[in-house]
Structure formats: structure tokens, C-alpha cells
């Protein structure tokens, strides 16, 4: 692992005002996708750490895709969902009154346990890194500068994101970027955050 490039992009969204804290999820039904991966592990961990038994105190209605969660919200079959960006912003544009109730990255950080909610890393083969240390260092410096530029220039970055087909429309990309937690964390800070996160999992 060369760097952490994305912190949490997961949010609890709600069509209503019931959910103001993790505790408010008790007794609720949450539609979600990502069973057996980061969304499930993060949600179960945060519920447990907030005194909520994920198997008894909430109902998690697992869907196969995030778009199914958005459809359930849009049809009124669900009022609370776990969604990643950019699905959150897309859903908010389609569903009047849908709000980001909880930022799971912020909720994770409140636990102050030395770990961080990580959803993306940059990896490389050890033999390539060892054979090309200068190129790897240059790449990481350029990557860090790129991250800094994107975070400081959302409108310009959104144009490029749309141009390269990452997100279809630049206005949506511009709305999404502030909530994507794009970072470039390397060295000992990366090791601490990553090892803490992996221990939690």
C-alpha cells in the first residue's frame, strides 16, 4: 500500500428528520447495498460501538445494488438508507426532502480509536516499488498535488471528471466532490490509520 486515497464516502440518508445521531437508528429499517464488504462492516461496527445490536436493534434490508436503495427511497418503500457518494447526491437530486442525516466518516472519527474509515488505497507490487523508488516518489508527489488541486478547485475538477466519464454531468460531480473525502495519506500516518482500520475489521 502506497497511500490512502479515499476516506469514508458512506452516509446515512433519510427522507425525514428522525435520524440525528447513531442512537436514532435503533428500531429503524435501513436499506443498504454492499453486504459482505466495507458498507456492511462499517455500519455494523458503528452500530455496535454506539450500543446498538445490528442483528436485533435494527433491520438492515440488503439490496444487490445502490441503485435499488435509491429506488426504494424514491418509491417510499424506505425512508432511511446507507449510500455512498455519488449515489447520495444523485438521490438527493431525484428525491425531494432527502437529506444526509449522518456522515459515517464523522461518526467513525468520534470514536477516537486511532483508526479511520478508509474506502480506497493505492497499491503497487513490492518488486516494482523497490526497482523504481524515484518513479514511485514522483508519482506520490504528483498524486498529492492532484488531490490538493481537486479539493481546492471543485468546479474545474468537475469538468474533467465529466470529460473523462467518471461522473456523467459536471454539475453533479461538483456537488459530490466535497463529500468524497479524497486524500493522499502516506508514511506513518497511513500505516497508523490503515492498521487501526484493519484491526477494527
Where are these regions (language model features)?
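Short, glycine-/small- and polar/acidic-enriched structural segments
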Residues: 1-55, 60-62, 79, 85, ...
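Extracytoplasmic/periplasmic, Sec-exported soluble proteins
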Residues: 4, 17, 31-39, 61, ...
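Well-formed, non-transmembrane alpha-helical positions, independent of function
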Residues: 24, 71-72, 90, 176, ...
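Predominant activation on well-ordered alpha-helical scaffold segments within soluble catalytic domains
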Residues: 44, 89, 195-199
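A broad structural signal for alpha-helix termini and local helix breaks/kinks
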Residues: 50-51, 95, 165-166
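Pocket-lining segment of extracytoplasmic ligand-binding domains
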Residues: 67-160
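Secondary-structure end/capping motifs
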Residues: 129-200
Amino acid at each position: 500500500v502506497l497511500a490512502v486515497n479515499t476516506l469514508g464516502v458512506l452516509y446515512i440518508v433519510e427522507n425525514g428528520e428522525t435520524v440525528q445521531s447513531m442512537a436514532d437508528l435503533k428500531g429503524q429499517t435501513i436499506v443498504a447495498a454492499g453486504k459482505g464488504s466495507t458498507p456492511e462492516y462499517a455500519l455494523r461496527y458503528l452500530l455496535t460501538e454506539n450500543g446498538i445490536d445490528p442483528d436485533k436493534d435494527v433491520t438492515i434490508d440488503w439490496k444487490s445494488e445502490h441503485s435499488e436503495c435509491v429506488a426504494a427511497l424514491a418509491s417510499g418503500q424506505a425512508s432511511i438508507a446507507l449510500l455512498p457518494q455519488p449515489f447520495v447526491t444523485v438521490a438527493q437530486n431525484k428525491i425531494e426532502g432527502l437529506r444526509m442525516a449522518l456522515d459515517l466518516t464523522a461518526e467513525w472519527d468520534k470514536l477516537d480509536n486511532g483508526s479511520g474509515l478508509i474506502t480506497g488505497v493505492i497499491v503497487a507490487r513490492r518488486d516494482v516499488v523497490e526497482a523504481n523508488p524515484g518513479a514511485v516518489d514522483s508519482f506520490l508527489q504528483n498524486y498529492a498535488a492532484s488531490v490538493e488541486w481537486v479539493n481546492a478547485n471543485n468546479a474545474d475538477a468537475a469538468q474533467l471528471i465529466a470529460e473523462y466519464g467518471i461522473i456523467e454531468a459536471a454539475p453533479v460531480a461538483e456537488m459530490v466532490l466535497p463529500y468524497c473525502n479524497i486524500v493522499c495519506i502516506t508514511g506513518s500516518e497511513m500505516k497508523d490509520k490503515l492498521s487501526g482500520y484493519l484491526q477494527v475489521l
